[in-house]
Structure formats: C-alpha cells, structure tokens
Amino acid sequence: MKKYLIFGFALFLVCFISQNCRKQPGRDSYSSVLAEFKNPASEFRSAPLWVWNDRITREKIETQLADFKAHGIGGVFIHPRPGLITPYLSEEWLDLCRYAVDKGKSLEMKVWLYDENSYPSGFAGGHVPAEMPDAAGKGLQMTKKGKLQLPLDSSPFLVLRKTASGFEDITQQARTQSFPEGEFYIFELKQGNPSPWYGGFTYVDLMRREVTEKFLDVTLNAYKKAIGDEFGATVPGVFQDEPNILPVGGENTINFTPLLFDKFKAKWGYDLRLNLPSLFEEIGDWMAVRHNFYATLLDLFIGNWAKPYYDYCTKNKLAFTGHYWEHEWPIPRLSPDNMAMAAYAHMPGIDCLMNDWSQGPHAQFGNTRAVKEIRSAASQMGQLRTMSETYGAGGWDMTFFDQKRIGDWEFVLGVNFLNQHLSYVTIKGARKRDHPLSFSYHEPWWQAYRLL
C-alpha cells in the first residue's frame, strides 16, 4: 500500500509540474506569479459598480478614480442609478464617460460599461420604448368562466371551449353569440402601465430580435462613437443586469411574444393555442406542454437577446458579462435556464447579495449551485474568468469579516473576478438607502480597505 501511495504522489507531482510549466506570456514562472500576487495588475483586482447618481462633473470623476486607485481598486463599472441628474446617454453623459476612460487609462485602471440606466437591462433608460413603441413587453392572462354572454368584457385574444377530446377555438363565435353553459378559457393580452422606473414607459420584450438590435444601437453604438477606440483595452467589456422575460399581468399570466405560437409549432409540431390550459391546470399532457413551452421561451430568449448581444461584443472586442434575473430556481417565466444563457458570455456572472447565509433554492450567499453553474459554463465554453456582483444590500453595518467570508466562499467555488455592489458618488438624501453599503470614502473603514 505504501509503495502505491508513493507512486501516486509522484505521479501527482509530475502532472502538477507539467501543467504549471506551460508557458504563458509574462506569467511563466513561480517568481513572476508570486510578484503579481503582491501587486496584481488591474485586471486581477476588484472593480465595483461606480454609481453615478448625481450631477456628474469632471472633478468628481477625477477625485473618485484617484481615490479608488489609492485603495487598491483595479477598475470600475460606470453605473447610472436613481438620483442621476446628468441626462443619460446625452452628449454631456458621453463626454463625461470619455473623460472617465481617459482618466482611468492614465491611472492604469479599467473602465467597464454598464448597459442600462439602473436595471433591468433592455429598455435603455426609456429610449428603446420611446423610439419603438411596440417594443413593450406583454403577457397572456387566462380567465375561466362557466358561460359567455354578449357583450364580452373585453376583446379577447383567444377563447377556448372544453370538449370531450380537448379544446376548440371559438374566438370568432364568442364575439357574435352567447354560450349559456360550458367550460370556457378566455385569454387576453396584457401590457404594462408606464412607470417612472422605465423612463415613463414600460419594460420591453427581449424575445424579439428587433428590440435587442434597437437596444444595442441606442446604447452600445452610442458608447462606440464616444469611446470605441478603447474597446478591448481601457474599456474591457460591458455588464448586463437582470434582463428577463417576466410576463405582464400578474396572476394567471404566461409569457407572450409575437413569434411564440409559430416558433412552438415549428419546434414541437402541434398548436400551442389549443393546449394553453395545460399551462395553468394539470389537464391533458400538461407536463410535456409545459416543458415544450419553457424550452421555446428559452430558445427565443437566447436567440433574440443573448446570442446577438454576445456576437456584438465579440465583434467589437468587448467582454460580455453581468447576470440574469437573480438565480432563484426554478422560475422559468423570468429566465428559463440561467446556465444555458451563461454559455453566451465571455465572463459568466452571478449576483450574490446581502449578508445572510442560506442554502435554499432562492438563496444568495450560500447558493452553491448558482456559483458552480457559471464556473461550469465558463469551463465548458473555454472562458477563463467568472464574475460575481457581491455584497449588495449587505447593510451599512457589514464588517470586513463578513466581506472576507463571502468573498472567500465565492473564490473557492470558482469566482475569480469580484464586482463590489456599490460605490456611490454621493449618498445625500434618499440615495443612502439604495442598497447600502458603499465601497467608497463614505465608509469609516475605507482607509483600511486596501488591506482587504
């Protein structure tokens, strides 16, 4: 037994040495790696979400970037957020971004883009629905009745009547005649109400390619004109935040997009319309219908959002990172499969919010599955880096001990790029209650932060 153990250990050493002796430009020796640990390059340091939530000025940019540099920060993500006064994506905004990139370059820091005015990604601070009114997200709401009387309460999208063998479409008849008895399933299209959060508009349908193309044009092409010469250099990439396909309408509502029924029929060979009740009740071949429905949504979300976004970034030398709507599982109506979406990222990412340990399916810190999913996706797709947006809403009382235990837990599971949530330009007024803490001069421990 002893000689087998010795042989096994010797084999391990041979493999370890052979792996670590593979030359990498500039990092091909133990001494150079050790030196880099002592003083990491900017790409191996953390980069917080730098919250622009005030009237932004060159003086504020210069002062805070220098402060970040002095405290060991390697870069920032320019993150517009509530409280912002400088008009988003205006010429003034883009000029300030240019100044931040130039100043970051002079400090040997990275200046990443964040693709939205707050979140979730996709509506471009209201510019997308303003320029494309039909981009608004929708939902299909079901109401069940025992009779139908004229006039109908609304103009339904679809009316089904239950029969002995399934369901029949009586939409046209229901608009001109009453049905005194039976089982009727009425489906209505719902659209969200305008909201200040979405710039006075509504969220958009990310299962439509033309919506994504409008978003990329309005957002990333604007940045490309202003700072595109630094794409892939001082500006390494772009962060998407919580894009999702949540249906509008609340209770008894399913996802809807104009291509849904045609895509479903082409993929599965039968008409989803006549099987919609199976998405609400355990009737018919409901398990197969639900699987096929959510698989279709996933195809639409990947094909019309994730892939074109990823392709744009690849073409323009940007690393596509960020994350989808949290990592609760399973909630397919929000994001059918986070791991499948992560395949279309140059740096797959997650959210790890708050400061409470939990291992449940809806957990943040403690959700091992979420971290291992992105590490696995990165490994399978040949990507080296994985990102975590960490510490958000941890509270003003979060300690260094808390920060280290959360960070260490993520690192040991495979995260290798830490994105702190958040670093505020200002905390005046209500801003101080926007998911604190802040990795900035506002914290009493900031002077010691470089040690951590």
Stretches with model-predicted labels:
Residues M1-Y4:
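Positively charged n-region of N-terminal signal peptides that target proteins for export
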Residues H79-E213, D217:
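Acidic/aromatic-lined carbohydrate-recognition and catalytic surfaces
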Residues Y30-L49, Q191, V204-K214, A222, ...:
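An acidic-aromatic substrate-binding cleft motif
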Residues S29-G75:
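Mature N-terminal segment immediately following signal peptide/propeptide cleavage
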Residues C15-S31:
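Bacterial Sec-dependent signal peptides at the C-terminal "C-region" and cleavage site
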Residues G8-C15:
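Bacterial N-terminal signal peptides
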Residues F44-A47, T57-E62, G75-V76, R81, ...:
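Carbohydrate-binding surfaces of carbohydrate-active enzymes
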Residues V51, S154-G166, T219-A222, E230, ...:
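Hydrophobic alpha-helical membrane-insertion signals
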